[in-house]
């Protein structure tokens, strides 16, 4: 089971968070996969958060992402009057190879989708969208994708899935699962006529 690959959040990180400052916040409403509490039962939750460190196939020179900073800001947000249960399942570490990371992410997404759980991925690079997209293969629904990017990432230069080729792989995927693709923020001077 790929969920067992998820690393818990360190107790030292959770102790840094001032609960008084975060009163009424998301932090006080969610169950967190921590060193002390272990992995929450994901079947009890409507929304699960997962941090992903993988960025080796990013188009951009990248350094390790600071998922702690992302979480600190996310946890500060106020929880509305919603009737949903939310869990932070921790972080998926890099696999030995990028393909190992893709496979683990695919399995996690597929498992959570089978329980009708909404998955929110934090971190990682654009190419991770491909294994997430592929996890919908066993579902009847078509997939809508919204990307916020200055380019369309439709390059066809190689078989490698990267931050510049992932959308081409999705659009021409044999599963025909893509219903709609919307790109927000593309810059005309960075996109070829063929892409537009």
Where are these regions (language model features)?
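Conserved alpha-helical scaffold segments that buttress catalytic/binding sites
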Residues: 2-49, 54-196
